[in-house]
C-alpha cells in the first residue's frame, strides 16, 4: 500500500485530524541507517511524527525539526520535515536494541531514556526560529508529543504512532495520527474520542489488515461527520548537496580548517540524514579556507 497522508476535520470542525500511512517512508529511513529493531521503531515513530507535523507549516520554505534526547543508548533522534510531507532524520546510535518491554513490545522508551527534553523547532525564515521544549514524559514519543501540544501549545491532543518491524528487519507497517480538539469543542466529544482510541486496535494492526488511512479515520470517527480536506504523498527525501556540506565544513572555523589543510590529507564528510559521503581534496580544503576566511 502506498504511503498517504490526509488532513481532515470532524464534528463541524470541532476536531482537527492529520493521519498517515508511512510504511515506505520509514522503511527507506531505516534501511539508510541500517537500524536494529528497537532503533528502527524509535526512528520510524519520529519520522512519522515529523511528516504529520510538517504539513502544518505555512510555506514550502519553512522547516520543522523534532529532537528527542533522553540520555538513553539511542543517543537522540533528530527529524526535519517540510510542508509537502517530505522528511529526513537520523538516530544517534542505529544499533540501539534491548529486550522487549513488559507488554512484549519494542522498548522505545528504554533506548530513548527519560532524562532529557523533546524539542520542536519551527524555522519560518525569521531572525530566530520558534523553539518549544518540554521534559520527556514517557520516552515513547507519541505520548511525549501529546504532552508537548497540551503544555506548550495549549491544544489538547492525542498522538498515535506505530511501527511494526518484521523478522527480516524490514518495516511491515508504520503510520500515525494527530487528533486535536479546537477551542470551544464539546468536552463530552473529547471524552468520546478518548474512549474510542482506547478501544481500537493499534494503527499498525489496522494497516497490516490492509485498511487505508481514510478507512482508519472513518473507523475512529464513525458517526462524527468526518471530512477529508487534503491528501499528500509523504516520502523520505534528503536534500543534501555538496554546497551545503561545504558550508557546514567551513563553519568548523579557520583554526580547525588550517590544521586539516596543514596535514595535507583528503577530508571526507558524511551527511547525517542519508550517509552520502562528500570528499574534499587537500587543494579543495585550501580553496574553502581562502573563500571563507581570507581577508578581503
From Swiss-Prot:
Highest taxon listed in the record's lineage: Bacteria
Keyword Nucleotide-binding: no
InterPro entries, per database record: Heat_shock_Hsp33, Heat_shock_Hsp33_C, Heat_shock_Hsp33_N
A cellular component term, taken from the record's GO annotations: cytoplasm
Entry keyword Zinc: yes
GO terms, molecular function: protein folding chaperone; unfolded protein binding
Cell location: Cytoplasm
Chief location bin: cytoplasm
Paired cysteines (S-S): 238-240, 271-274
One Pfam family, short name: HSP33
Keywords of this entry: Chaperone, Cytoplasm, Disulfide bond, Redox-active center, Zinc
Protein's GO biological process: protein refolding
Similarity section: Belongs to the HSP33 family.
Role according to the record: Redox regulated molecular chaperone. Protects both thermally unfolding and oxidatively damaged proteins from irreversible aggregation. Plays an important role in the bacterial defense system toward oxidative stress.
Protein name, as recorded: 33 kDa chaperonin
Lineage, uppermost ranks: Bacteria, Bacillati, Bacillota, Clostridia, Eubacteriales
Amino acid at each position: 500500500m502506498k504511503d498517504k497522508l490526509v488532513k481532515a476535520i470532524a464534528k463541524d470542525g470541532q476536531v482537527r485530524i492529520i493521519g498517515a500511512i508511512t510504511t515506505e517512508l520509514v522503511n527507506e529511513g531505516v534501511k539508510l541507517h541500517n537500524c536494529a529493531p528497537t532503533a528502527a521503531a524509535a526512528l520510524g515513530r519520529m519520522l512519522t511524527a515529523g511528516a504529520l507535523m510538517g504539513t502544518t507549516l505555512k510555506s514550502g520554505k519553512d522547516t520543522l525539526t523534532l529532537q528527542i534526547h533522553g540520555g538513553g543508548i539511542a543517543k537522540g533522534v533528530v527529524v526535519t520535515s517540510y510542508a509537502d510531507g517530505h522528511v529526513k532524520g537520523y538516530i544517534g546510535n542505529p544499533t540501539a536494541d534491548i529486550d522487549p518491554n513488559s507488554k512484549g513490545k519494542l522498548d522505545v522508551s528504554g533506548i530513548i531514556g527519560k532524562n532529557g527534553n523533546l524539542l520542536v523547532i519551527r524555522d519560518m525564515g525569521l531572525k530566530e526560529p520558534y523553539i518549544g521544549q518540554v521534559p520527556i514524559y514517557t520516552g515513547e514519543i507519541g505520548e511525549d508529543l501529546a504532552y508537548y501540544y497540551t503544555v506548550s501549545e495549549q491544544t489538547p491532543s492525542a498522538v498515535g504512532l506505530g511501527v511494526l518491524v518484521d523478522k527480516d528487519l524490514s518495516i511491515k507497517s508504520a503510520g500515525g495520527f494527530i487528533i486535536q480538539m479546537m477551542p470551544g469543542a464539546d468536552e463530552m466529544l473529547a471524552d468520546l474520542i478518548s474512549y474510542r482510541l482506547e478501544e481500537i486496535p493499534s494503527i499498525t494492526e489496522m494497516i497490516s489488515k490492509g485498511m487505508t488511512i481514510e478507512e482508519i479515520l472513518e473507523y475512529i470517527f464513525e458517526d462524527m461527520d468526518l471530512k477529508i480536506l487534503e491528501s499528500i504523498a509523504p516520502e523520505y527525501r534528503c536534500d543534501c548537496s555538496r554546497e551545503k556540506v561545504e558550508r557546514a565544513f567551513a563553519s568548523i572555523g579557520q583554526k580547525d580548517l588550517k590544521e586539516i589543510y596543514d596535514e595535507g590529507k583528503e577530508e571526507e564528510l558524511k551527511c547525517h540524514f542519508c550517509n552520502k559521503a562528500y570528499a574534499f581534496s587537500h587543494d579543495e580544503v585550501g580553496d574553502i579556507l581562502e573563500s571563507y576566511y581570507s581577508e578581503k
